[in-house]
Amino acid sequence: MAWSEIDEASRTWRIPAQRSKNGKAHLVHLSDPVWEIIQSLPRTSSLVFATSGGRNFQDFKKAKAALDRASGVTDWWLHDLRRTVVSGMARLGVPPHVADKILNHRSGTISGVAAVYQRHEFLAERKQALDAWSTHVAGVISGIKNTQKQI
């Protein structure tokens, strides 16, 4: 994530097509807690999350090992976080086609003629879903359980 990819006015991160899995540029809404974290970071490099040498962070194996030690949970993969988020969003009432757009998937939930003609990006719906997820995570962290659907 580069600072130049962040739009402060809209609080979004534009992932360039050359770095996305499906080759399409992707716009990600940055919820309030995420925005606060990003704004608290020093701008010592062109990258938002950089090593102390200012280079792109790449040692995910080492980071996962640290998370394993801290949590005591070891039987998981980083990719499981995507499944957890999408499953949690479903419980919050986020429609599958919106979750697909959040993950930048080519929609598996819209098929046939609709898949050919449907070009709406669901930006407002994605923002609402990510804000709802952010509220849910904050509740988990604080211990305050919110069981109501948010979308």
Task: Kindly give the residue locations of the regions a language model identified.
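C-terminal catalytic core of tyrosine-transesterase DNA break-rejoin enzymes
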Residues: 80-106
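Conserved tyrosine-mediated DNA breakage-rejoining catalytic core shared by Y-recombinases
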Residues: 1-40, 105-115
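Active-site/catalytic core of tyrosine-dependent DNA strand-transfer enzymes
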Residues: 10, 19, 29-74, 85, ...
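A general structural motif at alpha-helix termini
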Residues: 2, 85, 103, 117-121
